[in-house]
Amino acid sequence: MAAPVDDMFSRCVDSAKASNCVDVRFINNVKGKGLFAKKPFKKGDTIFIERPLVSSQFLWNALYKYRACEYCLRALETAEENARRLSGLPALILPHPELCKVRPDRHQACPQCQVMYCSSECRQAAMDQYHKILCLGPSNDDPDHPVNKLQDAWRSVHFPPETSSVMILAKMVATIKQTQDKERWQRLFTNFCSRTANEEEEIVHKLLGEKFQGQLGLLRNLFTTALYEDRLSQWFTPEGFRSLFSLVGTNGQGIGTSSLSQWVHACDALELPRQQREQLDAFIDQLYKDIDKETGDFLNCEGSGLFLLQSSCNHSCVPNAEASFPENNFLLHLTALGDIGPGEEICISYLDCCQRDRSRHSRHKILRENYLFICSCQKCLSQMDDADMTSEDEEEVEGEGETEGEDMEDEMTDV
C-alpha cells in the first residue's frame, strides 16, 4: 500500500510549503509515479529540503576514521583535522580557521555505547527513533555481538567504493520495533518501488557479487539473530529479505559531507585583495594535490538514506533538478538546474556528470545494470539512431554492440 500524499511530504523541513510547490502523480503503469511542479521555479531555486526516513554512514567509511554524526552524518572533524588526515601532513595549519563551521564543544556521545553525535538534538532524535534498540552499550566493541557480526559480514562482501549499508535495514527494523505508530512507519517504508523476483536478484547480485546467494543467506541469518521482530516476520524470510535489499539498493540516495569542503566554499566567498586571493587559491590547490597523492578520491564522510519525496523523481539524462547536501548533514536540497514551469515533471539524473557525457549505449548499460530500466528521455530519443556501441575508450572494457533487453522498463520509477 502506497503512502498517502500527506505522508509524502512528512519528512520535508517545511512540509506545507513543499506540498504547495510540487505534486506526486501517477503517470502510467510503465513509469509509475513522478514529481511535478505546481508553481514556476527559476534556475537555482530550492524546490524542497527533505530529511531521510533513515540514513547510515557506510561501514568501511566509518572504519577508516571518517568521523560523522551517527544520526545526521554531519562531519565531526574540524576542517583542519580533516585536511591533516587526508593529506598526511600532521602539522598543517589552515588559514582563516574562523570559517570552519564544526563545533566540537557541541558534540555528544551516547553515554551507554559512546557513539558520537554532533549535538544533543541529534543524540535525542536517534534515541527517540531507533537507538534504544540498536545501542550496544558496553558490547559496542564486542566482535561477538550479533549487530557487530552483521556489520563485519557486510564489510566482507561489500567493499569500497560503497553504495549501501546493511545498517539502513537495521534502522528500518529498529524504527518500527521502537515506535508507537508501527503501521505508519511500515506504510512509509512500503512506499518505495517494488520489483519482480528476477529484478531483485539482479540488484542483489550487483551489490554482493557472484556468490550473492550464499552471502545473502548468511546476512539474513545474522540479521534475524540480531533484530527479529514478529510483526515484521515477512522481512526475515528469504524472499522478504531479498526485497529489502532490492529496496535499499535501488532507492538509497548517496550522502556526502565534508568539513573541509565547507571551509573551501567559505574561502571562495571571501572578498580579498588580489594578492591574498592568489595566495589562498594556491594554498588550496596545493592542499588538494597533497590529498590526491595521499588519499585519492575518498574525501568525504559517505553514507546513504531513504528519502520519501525525492524518491518520486524519475531519471533524465538532461535533468532539470539535482540533489545536494550543502548543510554538511543529511538534509537533501532539491535545486532547479533551469527554469521549470507549472505542470512540468521534475527529473534528476541517476548518472554523474561524466557518465551523462558518454554515448547513449554506455548510459543505457549503466542504467540497466544499476536500476534495471531503459531511459527514454529527450536526449536518448534524439540519439536512437546512434550505433549501439560504447565510446571508443570504453570498447575494450565493455565490448561492442550490446543489444538492449526487450523486457526492460522504459523508465525508472521511485529512485
UniProtKB/Swiss-Prot annotation:
Tissues expressing this chain: Expressed at high levels in the ovary and at lower levels in the fin, testis and brain.
Keywords assigned: Cytoplasm, Metal-binding, Methyltransferase, S-adenosyl-L-methionine, Transferase, Zinc, Zinc-finger
GO annotation (BP), single: primitive hemopoiesis
GO cellular component: cytoplasm
GO molecular function: histone H3K36 trimethyltransferase activity; histone H4K20 methyltransferase activity; protein-lysine N-methyltransferase activity; zinc ion binding
Recorded catalytic activity of this chain's protein: L-lysyl-[protein] + 3 S-adenosyl-L-methionine = N(6),N(6),N(6)-trimethyl-L-lysyl-[protein] + 3 S-adenosyl-L-homocysteine + 3 H(+); L-lysyl(20)-[histone H4] + 3 S-adenosyl-L-methionine = N(6),N(6),N(6)-trimethyl-L-lysyl(20)-[histone H4] + 3 S-adenosyl-L-homocysteine + 3 H(+); L-lysyl(36)-[histone H3] + 3 S-adenosyl-L-methionine = N(6),N(6),N(6)-trimethyl-L-lysyl(36)-[histone H3] + 3 S-adenosyl-L-homocysteine + 3 H(+)
InterPro entries noted in UniProt: SET_dom, SET_dom_sf, SMYD5_SET, Znf_MYND
Subcellular location: Cytoplasm
EC number: 2.1.1.-, 2.1.1.372, 2.1.1.359
Zinc-finger keyword on record: yes
Zinc finger motifs (MYND-type), residue ranges: 95-135
Protein name: Protein-lysine N-trimethyltransferase SMYD5
Organism (species): Danio rerio (Zebrafish)
Gene expressing this chain: smyd5
